[in-house]
Amino acid sequence: MTKREEQGLMPQYVIEREMPGVGKLGPADLKMASQTSCKVLAELGPEIQWVHSYVTDNKIYCVYRAPSEDIIREHAQRGGFPANKIVEVKTMIDPTTAE
């Protein structure tokens, strides 16, 4: 059981999406992709939540909260997004972990 599950929180996942050239997209394209994602999230219901995403040159790394990997794959399929790798976050660390 992860720390989040012990605290009664939804599991958290990092999704790696291979999207060549995505880092060159402009604000309008990113807005459209975000709107598509949010539309699918609304259809799937409140049990899946998009936290945020990191856009790099050729990949997007998304952080989601969801009860399972399956619903994340469903979101990707419905939205037309790749989900090349999905991993569950076991715990988080930051500089305060060193204290």
Task: State each model region's role.
Residues 13-17, 50-76:
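Short, well-ordered beta-strand segments in beta-rich or mixed alpha/beta enzyme
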Residues 38, 60-64, 68, 84, ...:
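Short amphipathic alpha-helical patches
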Residues 66-92:
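An amphipathic, aromatic/His-enriched active-site/gating alpha helix that lines ligand/cofactor pockets
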